[in-house]
């Protein structure tokens, strides 16, 4: 997928250099990250950074963290976790994340 892939909101989705490096290192593809952004199973706001955290559940959960920047969404990192409930509970309990969807 190219950087002009659109989110469900109609906004263009781009990836930071860090996100691209993380996807290569973690053997993840853009399509999976875009799917997480477009169709998350759960959505959170990181209160520290103001970024949106999209969680897409499968065998392992894919987490895509992104910013809304003017006319586009910029994915800043992507990772998989085998323990999404533990991650989410910890972030919510510490007040780092709030559920938005």
Please give the residue ranges for each predicted region.
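Ribonuclease/tRNase effector modules and their secretory precursors
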Residues: 1-101
């Amino acid at each position: 997928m190219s950087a002009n892939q659109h989110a469900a909101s109609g906004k263009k989705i781009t990836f930071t250099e860090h996100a691209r490096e993380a996807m290569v290192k973690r053997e993840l593809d853009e399509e999976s990250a875009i799917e997480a952004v477009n169709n998350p199973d759960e959505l959170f706001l990181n209160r520290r950074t103001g970024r949106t955290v999209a969680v897409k559940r499968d065998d392992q959960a894919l987490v895509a963290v992104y910013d809304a920047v003017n006319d586009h969404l910029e994915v800043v990192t992507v990772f998989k976790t085998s323990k999404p409930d533990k991650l989410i509970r910890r972030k919510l309990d510490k007040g780092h994340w709030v559920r938005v969807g």
